[in-house]
Amino acid sequence: FPLEVVPNSPATRNAFRIQQDEGRIWVAPGGYDVVGTPVFNNDGIFHLEGLNWTNYPNALFGSFKDIVEIFPHPTVENHIYASSFGSGLLELAIDGESVSIVREINEATTDGAMPSISGSGEHRVADMDLDADGNIWFSNPLTDRPLGVIRPDGTVECYGLGAAGAGANVLKLMVTSGGQVWQQIRNNGILVTRLEDGVPQETVRLGASEGSGDLPSESVLCFAEDQDGEIWIGTNEGLAVLFSPENIFEPNRSYDASILVIDEDGDGNGERVLGSEAINDIEVDGANKKWFGTANNGVFYTNSNGRTQLQRFSKTNSPLASDVILDIEIDDQTGMVYFGTDQGIVSYQGQATAGEKTMSDVFAYPNPVEPGYSGPILIRGLVTNAQVKITDVEGNIVFETVAEGGQAIWDGKNFDGLKVASGIYLAFISDDLGVNTEVAKIMILN
């Protein structure tokens, strides 16, 4: 009998969009090309839980293909929404290796509430995001109602956005903490819509002209909101930052984006951060630091203000399979960073996790630290920017640091770079105001 060897991996190298869900990873392998048309991908859906990959073949979804986004259901466990660049939306129930279709969402099943492209039955649902009220917003491009929403009760509605949005080829979408919906328009800037009580109120288009966005280019490729509410925008000609997005809907207020410049000499001839790199994706980690995935030059990792490059990954200096980065996703629980390239997925153990609201579940790992272990000691469950001081039982401080988001890392060495002696060590932890405190014990065995 022939031997069939099936690797524990995604079924193919296609990784158009990656989505994390409480430690689980979903991969949408479909996509669209540079002019925004379907690529007719039939790879299905890939799912990573723990160390095991499960591949759900496209045959499970009938004619549904070009799956470009997976979004976890916000309230129903093991349910996801899958969006297709051609066939609308599916709500799916996942049970191990089996999957069942709960419902299809398209023009026919919503009695016309979700219009298709020119009444053809084609729906290119490019992206989804969740607001604070449990509404899932989605892009419905090339229609007269390009902004759609799935309400918590399952009702589907789509909205027109005035002249700026009529027929717009809207792709990526983001809901901000300030109640705005941002939609990338292919080669035509960004639509920003203000929500009130879950209903669109007004829409403004941001472009490359001064006074209406002043973007480096109207070919916007991505955007991300950081922990300070600032919007980082990637275009085919570099990076821009909108520091006060609330100004967009305020009369007589500027909402032009800023180009970040590093001018070390102060002579006014500084260099733009990331230059004119085409930036396909931006992700913000638990420490508010920025990951930039470029179209041809790998990955850049910077500090929170973007002006200091911390790391650079490329095909030549790292395990990246390609310098063409399609998507970046961060597992906020572990700090693991996933890079989707045109040649497959690569993961990297980052240092930052999402900060906790309280420190009720602080722990160290590994603990005890066994003889021969030389890796990092992780202290997790911390609030953002927690102060950590590690002492021996006599109270001598051997190490101190500030948490990266919700995690602090100790290499098991003292201030002189020497490995500490065997014994019990105490990690004294406090928030940045010194109000909330916690203590963790770490046993070192040499």
Roles of regions detected by a PLM:
Residues 437-442:
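Edge beta-strands of extracellular beta-sandwich domains
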Residues 1-361, 397, 428:
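Carboxylate-rich, polar loop motifs that coordinate divalent cations or form catalytic acidic clusters
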Residues 387-398, 425:
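Short, glycine-anchored, charge-dense loop/turn motifs used at functional sites
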Residues 357-389, 407-410:
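Glycine-centered coil/turn sites that cap beta-strands in beta-rich domains
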Residues 444-446:
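Interdomain boundary/hinge segments at the C-termini of tandem beta-sandwich modules
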Residues 220, 325-326, 372-377, 423:
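Repeat-blade elements of multi-bladed beta-propeller folds
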Residues 322, 371, 384, 416, ...:
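Surface-exposed loops/turns
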Residues 403-434:
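Short, surface-exposed loop/turn motifs with a glycine/proline- and acidic-biased composition
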